[in-house]
Amino acid sequence: MRIRVGFGFDVHQLVEGRELWLGGVLLEHTKGLLGHSDADVLLHAVCDALLGAANMRDIGYHFPDTAGEFKNIDSKILLKKTVELIASKGYKVGNIDATICAERPKLKAHIPLMQETMANVMGIDVDDISIKATTTEKLGFTGREEGISAYATVLTEKD
């Protein structure tokens, strides 16, 4: 068995008038993330990590923000397509370790549903997805609540 590791990162600006999607879950908040799609930074970071592990470039290459077909698209669809892309090269998801950086909303109570949602989309076990939430102690753009970022590391396997 061959294993490969990938790393992904994404960040989007918080703005009024948008829904806040994280980990495929709609969260109640006064602001949402600005982006061409639903701007789910966690799913985008995971997509980039998976594509990186398979040496298949990045999310912007496969799902460009210049393409109308991806305007306001549900990022769960992008994640499913990404899993299919890496499967075309013989890779499957081993496990995911991700961190979301946000001052608000508090995310602890939402993490189990994010894990369940992502596991269902990818066809993997919930125990193979670790999601953590942290703040930047009020430092930088995240601390000023101007945006939310996410980091993801994945392990992929190929027989």
What are these language model-derived features?
Residues 125-128:
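Short acidic capping loops at alpha-helix termini that bridge into adjacent secondary structure
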Residues 2-112, 121-122:
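RNase III-family endoribonuclease catalytic core
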Residues 118:
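Glycine-rich, mobile lid/loop segments that gate access to catalytic sites or pores
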Residues 111-115, 144-145:
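Short, low-complexity, polybasic intrinsically disordered segments
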